[in-house]
Amino acid sequence: MISRIPGRDLGKAVGHRVIVKPFSGATTKAMNHYLKPSLEFSPNEVILHIGTNDLKTREPKAVAESIVDLARQIESTCDTTVTLSELVCRKDKLDQAVKTANKHLGKFCHQNGWKLIHHENISYNGLNKGGLHLNSKGNVQFYNNFKSHLE
């Protein structure tokens, strides 16, 4: 999903540099490895949009806890602000798991003082025919949610 966010355009819209690094199909475990090179540059903020791929094999609370572990690892590695991004709805049997994971993410963000980018404004109408990825309408909402956070 994040691969359709044009970092350069988003940066121009919010008035500062934005780098988008998509890792399609990645799980929270894989992100431990993918993030390390990016953290060497000490970014001002890291926004984590991860977890949907974990829901196929793990319970929603465990997925949220893995995201939190990743966020804590980032905080312990460099002086950066961590923001979490809600999982986006789906039109399959995992949609309820997405909602449950998002509730846990909200609680964990509150407990840790992190911001959470909400995506409840993306409905099934924002999904493609397969029901798992965003269509053009959903991509616009997704982009705008990140833009609103970064402004």
Language-model-derived ranges and their functions:
Residues D9-I19, A26, N32-E151:
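Alpha-helical cap/lid subdomain in secreted, periplasmic
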Residues M1-R8:
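Catalytic nucleophile-elbow at a beta strand-turn-alpha helix junction centered on a G-D-S/GDSL motif
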Residues I2, G25-A26:
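Short active-site-proximal "capping" loops at secondary-structure junctions
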